[in-house]
């Protein structure tokens, strides 16, 4: 007998909740914000909208389904199951945060603050939850399959991300490494920089886009479902032993970007989740082969 679907509601602690937890009471939090020229009512109203959205989406889950909730900070300890339907209630970045822990489960994104969030990944309003949840397993329902980026270390540690993967020193200080493209005639360059970003078309709406735009890059950014990645070296430093000729490019199909670590304390993390970083000691390969996640 197959298990009934389980709706996993993914949410994030609101700014209001964080403020009250830090300062102890609503009044103390209000005083703290007031001393910085802010009004707590604006923060509290966003909190109330988020809680209302979460309650509305939760109430729309079919009665025959199981359901549970997980906060963003607990994602790395949560065990997702094959029959799960992941329901993200919050900001676009929350979809990217949860994607790395999934293996083909469908994801629905609901925007708690339309107009404030771009709505690239949380495209739906809570009022549409009942209809969307009922149609998840209906044959013919349109689904967007998004490309992901994968990094594999020489010790077989693997990291997958929906937006981008960053390699660099803890604290974003100078990172030293050798960078090269597999199958590019053996061209390898020693570099010192503040890190390397490799991202997808989904990531092209966030951190990756800011680097691309600031440089006025001629590279065409990929679409979210396109099997192509783009990469950028941040602030490469020219010196007698380090170069700046390989600072951006694209990875198409099975193309691989290879980095060999030459300084201590380098880490790699995905989608801004620094707390889930992997420490590197030797080599790292970037590829877009993780698109089937």
Positions of PLM-derived features:
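Short glycine/serine/threonine-rich phosphate/pyrophosphate-binding segments
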Residues: 94-98, 205-208
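Conserved small/polar residues in nucleotide/adenosyl-binding loops
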Residues: 286-291
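A short, gly/pro- and small-residue-rich
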Residues: 99-112
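Short gly/pro/ser/thr-enriched loop/turn and capping motifs at secondary-structure boundaries
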Residues: 95, 113-118, 238-239
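Gly/Ser/Thr-rich active-site loops/lids in small-molecule metabolic enzymes
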Residues: 188-239
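Catalytic core of DAGKc-family lipid kinases
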Residues: 113-194
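A conserved acidic, glycine/proline-rich C-terminal tail/linker
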Residues: 243-282
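ATP/NTP phosphate-donor binding region
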Residues: 1-89, 120-143, 157-159
């Amino acid at each position: 007998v197959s298990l009934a679907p389980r709706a996993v509601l993914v949410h994030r602690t609101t700014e209001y909740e964080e403020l009250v937890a830090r300062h102890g009471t609503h009044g103390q939090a209000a005083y703290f914000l007031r001393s910085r020229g802010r009004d707590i009512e604006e923060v509290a109203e966003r909190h109330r909208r988020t809680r209302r959205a979460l309650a509305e989406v939760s109430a729309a889950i079919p009665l025959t389904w199981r359901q549970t909730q997980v906060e963003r900070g607990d994602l790395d300890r949560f065990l997702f199951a094959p029959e799960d339907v992941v329901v993200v209630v919050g900001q676009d970045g929350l979809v990217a945060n949860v994607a790395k822990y999934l293996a083909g489960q469908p994801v629905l994104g609901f925007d708690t603050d339309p107009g404030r969030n771009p709505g690239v990944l949380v495209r739906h309003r809570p009022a549409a939850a009942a209809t969307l949840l009922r149609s998840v397993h209906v044959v013919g329902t349109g689904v967007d399959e998004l490309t992901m980026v994968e990094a594999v270390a020489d010790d077989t540690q693997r990291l997958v991300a929906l937006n981008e993967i960053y390699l660099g020193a803890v604290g974003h200080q100078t990172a030293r490494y050798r960078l090269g493209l597999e199958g590019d005639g053996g061209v390898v360059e020693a570099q010192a920089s503040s890190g390397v970003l490799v991202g997808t078309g989904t990531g092209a709406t966030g951190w990756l886009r800011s680097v691309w735009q600031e440089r006025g890059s001629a590279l065409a950014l990929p679409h979210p479902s396109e099997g192509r990645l783009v990469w950028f070296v941040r602030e490469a430093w020219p010196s007698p032993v380090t170069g700046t000729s390989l600072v951006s490019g694209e990875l198409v199909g099975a193309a691989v970007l290879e980095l060999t670590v030459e300084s201590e304390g380098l880490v790699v993390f995905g989608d801004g989740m620094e707390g889930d970083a992997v420490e590197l000691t030797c080599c790292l390969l970037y590829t877009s082969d993780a698109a089937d996640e």
